[in-house]
Regions:
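General structural signal for secondary-structure boundaries
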Residues: 11-13, 183-184
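A glycine-rich, hydrophobic loop/mini-helix early in the fold
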Residues: 14-23
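Glycine-rich ThDP/TPP pyrophosphate-binding loop and its adjacent helix/strand module
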Residues: 23-204
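Single conserved hydrophobic/aromatic residue that forms the stacking wall/gate
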Residues: 1-10
């Protein structure tokens, strides 16, 4: 009963995408969302905050790990690389930076807007251990997290090659869906697509 109730709560929350005051209003707000340690919105700040949290863990001799997710368009921000340089210098092996590498940002293809490639080599230059994976493959994601846990003396960057809008037929590889909600008809199609994708995952 608990599991069913929880699933219903999650589903109810999903329909509040972009509604002001909801969990999914847009950018996460630490005052309203349990488990969120930092309000965000401005591009480039997440990695810096994560580096600070990881450094605090080292200074306080705490045994925790910090995971941060950033976009491949977002790493065009210089602040990301300042943070990466410091993290590598301090050998923050409790830090994992995951780059969502779908090659699309709000303005189009990232390699045409301002190419950050090769992403893995750039992180390696700042003393990161890098892992390149298929970011739509859960087995590869799990394996990368395990590898990151075993890595000592340097932070880890996981370059997750993904498909934007994966699983929703009309959203896949479409930059236009970067920040808008579907209409009622599109919502119904998307839910059917995702239910099929979910069933396929459960059969693996």
């Amino acid at each position: 009963a608990y599991r069913r109730q929880r699933q219903m709560c999650i589903r109810d929350s999903l329909v509040t995408l972009r509604h002001t005051g909801s969990y999914l209003q847009g950018h996460p707000d630490m005052k309203h969302i349990p488990g969120v340690d930092m309000s965000s919105g401005s591009l480039g700040q997440g990695v810096s905050a994560a580096v600070g949290m990881a450094a605090a863990g080292k200074f306080d001799h705490k045994d925790y790990r910090v995971y941060t997710l950033t976009g491949d368009g977002e790493i065009q921000e210089g602040q990301i690389w300042e943070a990466a340089m410091w993290a590598g210098h301090r050998k923050l092996d409790n830090l994992v930076v995951i780059v969502d590498n779908n090659n699309l940002q709000i303005d189009g293809e990232i390699d045409k807007v301002c190419s950050p490639y090769p992403i893995d080599k750039k992180f390696e230059a700042f003393n990161f251990h890098t892992i390149v994976i298929d970011g739509n493959d859960f087995d590869q994601i799990r394996a990368a997290f395990e590898e990151a846990k075993k890595t000592k003396g340097q932070p880890t960057a996981i370059i997750a090659k993904t498909i934007k809008g994966k699983g929703v037929s009309f959203m896949e590889n479409e930059a236009g869906w970067h920040g808008k909600a579907p209409n009622d008809e599109q919502y119904e199609i998307a839910m059917k697509d995702l239910e099929k994708a979910g069933e396929a995952l459960c059969q693996k």
